[in-house]
């Protein structure tokens, strides 16, 4: 990477040198309006989304009760990634998050790849979200006459408006979205535990271990289905790294981030693993479906009135939350890239309310293409973009772990200082996590229908990234030459 980028980062790590130069040119101008409660609930919201409320049904049917093990394993590695990112945040808080760290530890090419792969993840996830919102809205008969693409466009417009107002409004919206999701899960788990304890029948089935032992055991379809659902399981955890982006807009990241990151592990265990275990004990896995929330399947099985309506509203909330987070994070990431020259200049523009609206609007533009996808192939839109998004998040996590490896190596050389909040077991933890993530991509090849197509996208994306780099490298070099840190006074 350029010497200037390193110098800038080192100045940020040692503010006594000059307290006026930000660590990343893209960090300047942000408000610090996100409070501890916002970041804590953003961490929760990132761990609970449509991947659980809707996706768990189809995965439970395909993989059986062993899905809980898949969520646990992926959850542990997701925690390692966020722990590593949390350590980097405490070393140097930045709204550019891992893109800023990639710039420091991997150079401008690393930052370029990290940023655009993250944009690929969230822009395609945004398409998936507005597609999901349209599908969920069609659940109610009053909306069935409205075309899916119209509903998708309305959802995008509403969330865009919220993001353009201020970061405080974003934080409040995410706070209440998370409250709804957590309250729903807690309520369901209490009902599920009651059904289990009282042996109350669900759809004519008696809850208990018999739902597992009498229906093929933990692996009713073997190991391979569990391996194949791992891609979707990782996608379920895709917003956890949002904590690192949000840290750049908090007044006290050194107090807030460790608490938020450390709470992720037990939330994963409770909400994902606990919920899936409970679902497996309440009904045979074969009775769940990818077309219906597993929670609706259970609640409808005990005759709860309007169970489908309530859960559909919650899943709708989860999709809106994901779209909200995607616009927020890509706006900040693209601004960091624009200030370094690797993204269009207009994505670096800030509004008077300190919102990087240029990057947000670019993400929305891609989502509008998704509206077109909803118009052309409404039945396939969700599946198409989900595969692309999964590659984006896996590459982002790999880059975070590589950045942390370089960071630790420099710390051992005495070039930087590690904070007290650390990823344990380095460098083994990073290497094992990277190996796991790459293995997930490789094993997708065994899924001929979907996974193989996803893997074949890798060289296509690589060619696009290389072509894009040749298009921006001169501007990146020029920008690096312009942004030399101010001399000490």
UniProtKB/Swiss-Prot annotation:
Gene3D superfamilies xrefs: Amino acid/polyamine transporter I (1.20.1740.10)
Biological process, per Gene Ontology: amino acid transport; transmembrane transport
Membrane topology, as annotated: Multi-pass membrane protein
InterPro entries: AA-permease/SLC12A_dom (IPR004841), Amino_acid_permease_CS (IPR004840)
Subcellular location: Cell membrane
Parts forming coiled coils: none
UniProt similarity note: Belongs to the amino acid-polyamine-organocation (APC) superfamily. Amino acid transporter (AAT) (TC 2.A.3.1) family.
UniProt-recorded name of the protein: L-asparagine permease
Gene responsible for this protein: ansP
């Amino acid at each position: 990477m350029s010497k200037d980028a390193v110098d800038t980062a080192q100045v940020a790590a040692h503010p006594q040198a000059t307290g006026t130069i930000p660590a990343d040119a893209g960090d300047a101008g942000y408000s610090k309006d996100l409070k501890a409660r916002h970041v804590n609930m953003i961490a929760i919201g990132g761990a609970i989304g449509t991947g659980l409320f809707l996706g768990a049904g189809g995965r439970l049917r395909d993989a059986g009760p062993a899905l809980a093990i898949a969520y646990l394993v992926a959850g542990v590695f997701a925690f390692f990634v966020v722990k590593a990112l949390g350590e980097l945040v405490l070393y140097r808080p930045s709204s550019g998050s891992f893109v800023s760290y990639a710039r420091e530890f991997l150079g401008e090419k690393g930052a370029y790849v990290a940023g655009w792969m993250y944009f690929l993840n969230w822009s395609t996830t945004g398409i998936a979200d507005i597609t999901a919102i349209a599908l969920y809205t069609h659940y109610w008969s009053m909306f069935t006459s409205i075309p899916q693409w119209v509903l998708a466009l309305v959802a995008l417009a509403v969330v865009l408006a919220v993001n353009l107002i201020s970061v405080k409004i974003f934080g409040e919206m995410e706070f209440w979205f998370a409250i709804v999701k957590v309250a729903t899960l807690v309520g369901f788990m209490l009902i599920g535990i009651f059904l289990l304890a009282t042996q109350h029948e669900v759809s004519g089935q008696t809850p208990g271990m018999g739902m597992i032992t009498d229906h093929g055991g933990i692996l009713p379809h073997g190991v391979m289905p569990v391996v194949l659902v791992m891609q979707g399981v990782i996608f379920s955890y895709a917003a956890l790294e949002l904590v690192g982006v949000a840290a750049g807009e908090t007044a006290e990241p050194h107090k807030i981030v460790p608490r938020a990151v450390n709470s992720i592990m037990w939330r994963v265990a409770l909400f994902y693993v606990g919920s899936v275990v409970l679902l497996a004990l309440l009904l045979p896995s074969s009775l769940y479906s990818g077309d219906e929330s597993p929670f609706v399947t259970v609640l409808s099985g005990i005759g709860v009135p309007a169970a489908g309506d309530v859960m559909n509203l919650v899943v709708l909330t989860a999709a809106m939350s994901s779209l909200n987070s995607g616009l927020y994070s890509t706006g900040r990431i693209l601004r960091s890239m624009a200030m370094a020259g690797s993204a269009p200049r207009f994505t670096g523009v800030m509004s008077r309310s300190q919102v990087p609206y240029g990057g947000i609007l670019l993400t929305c533009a891609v989502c509008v293409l998704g509206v077109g996808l909803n118009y052309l192939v409404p039945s396939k839109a969700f599946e198409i973009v989900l595969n692309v998004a999964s590659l984006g998040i896996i590459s982002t996590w790999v880059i975070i772990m590589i950045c942390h490896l370089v960071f630790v190596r420099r710390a051992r050389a005495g070039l930087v200082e590690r904070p007290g909040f650390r990823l344990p077991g380095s460098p083994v933890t990073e290497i094992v996590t990277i190996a796991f993530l790459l293995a997930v991509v490789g094993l997708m090849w065994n899924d001929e229908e979907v996974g193989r197509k996803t893997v074949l996208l890798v060289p296509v994306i690589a060619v696009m990234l290389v072509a894009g780099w040749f298009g921006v490298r001169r501007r990146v070099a020029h920008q690096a030459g312009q942004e030399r840190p101010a001399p000490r006074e």
